[in-house]
């Protein structure tokens, strides 16, 4: 089976492990985008600690789950989002206002939509988490 997206596979593995009540999940292969996405999720408390394991191939990540995650997903293709359009995307993707985050990749790094609005940067939409 061919991989559509490494990030999509990682978030799908996290979703499935969370639904089945697992305490941790192994993600492979690893990438910088996955690590930055997980850092944003960890900052907002959706996941616990995660550890990168270098196996001299593509790497692995072990993520500790804490049961707070409802859903996370990838938006494909990665649409360009202007600062004014962020509100429309949050309304479409998230179940309610003030609940969940849309994660963007910007010139200032990978961040959630609130941080992007504060820093006044726009970019491409990666995914969502709530």
From Swiss-Prot:
Q: Which GO BP annotation is one of this protein's?
A: translation
Taxonomically, the superkingdom here is Eukaryota
What GO molecular-function term can you cite, just one? structural constituent of ribosome
Pfam families associated with the record: Ribosomal_S8
UniProt keyword Zinc present: no
Keywords carried by this UniProt record: Ribonucleoprotein, Ribosomal protein
Which PROSITE patterns does the entry mention? RIBOSOMAL_S8
* Ranges that cross the membrane: none
Q: Can you cite an annotated GO cellular component?
A: ribosome
The protein's matches in SUPFAM superfamilies, at most eight in alphabetical order, are given as: Ribosomal protein S8 (SSF56047)
Does Ribonucleoprotein show up as a keyword for this record? yes
Q: Which family does it belong to?
A: Belongs to the universal ribosomal protein uS8 family.
* NCBIfam families per record: PRK04034.1
What is this protein called in UniProt? Small ribosomal subunit protein uS8
What organism does this protein naturally occur in? Candida glabrata (strain ATCC 2001 / BCRC 20586 / JCM 3761 / NBRC 0622 / NRRL Y-65 / CBS 138)
- Show the taxonomic lineage: Eukaryota, Fungi, Dikarya, Ascomycota, Saccharomycotina
From the UniProt record, report the name of the gene that encodes this protein.
RPS22
């Amino acid at each position: 089976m061919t991989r559509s997206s490494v990030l999509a596979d990682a978030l799908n593995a996290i979703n499935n492990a969370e639904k089945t009540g697992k305490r941790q999940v192994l993600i492979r292969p690893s990438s910088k985008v996955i690590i930055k996405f997980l850092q944003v999720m960890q900052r907002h408390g959706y996941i616990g600690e995660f550890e990168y394991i270098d196996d001299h191939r593509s790497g692995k990540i072990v993520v500790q789950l804490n049961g707070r995650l409802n859903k996370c997903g990838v938006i494909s293709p990665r649409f360009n989002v202007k600062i004014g359009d962020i509100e429309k995307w949050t309304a479409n993707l998230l179940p309610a206002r003030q609940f969940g985050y849309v994660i963007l990749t910007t010139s200032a790094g990978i961040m959630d939509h609130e941080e992007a609005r504060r820093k006044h940067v726009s970019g491409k939409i990666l995914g969502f988490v709530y």
